[in-house]
Amino acid sequence: YGIHCNTLL
């Protein structure tokens, strides 16, 4: 959660 470039995946 939010670990890859501010993604919510």
Swiss-Prot record:
Transmembrane segments: none annotated. It catalyses: D-sedoheptulose 7-phosphate + D-glyceraldehyde 3-phosphate = D-erythrose 4-phosphate + beta-D-fructose 6-phosphate. The keyword Transferase applies. Its EC number is 2.2.1.2. Keywords: Pentose shunt, Schiff base, Transferase. GO terms for biological process: pentose-phosphate shunt. The keyword DNA-binding does not apply. One of its GO terms (molecular function) is transaldolase activity. Pathway: Carbohydrate degradation; pentose phosphate pathway; D-glyceraldehyde 3-phosphate and beta-D-fructose 6-phosphate from D-ribose 5-phosphate and D-xylulose 5-phosphate (non-oxidative stage): step 2/3. It is an enzyme of class 2 (transferase). Transaldolase is important for the balance of metabolites in the pentose-phosphate pathway. Homodimer. Belongs to the transaldolase family. Type 1 subfamily. This is Transaldolase-3. It comes from Cyberlindnera jadinii.
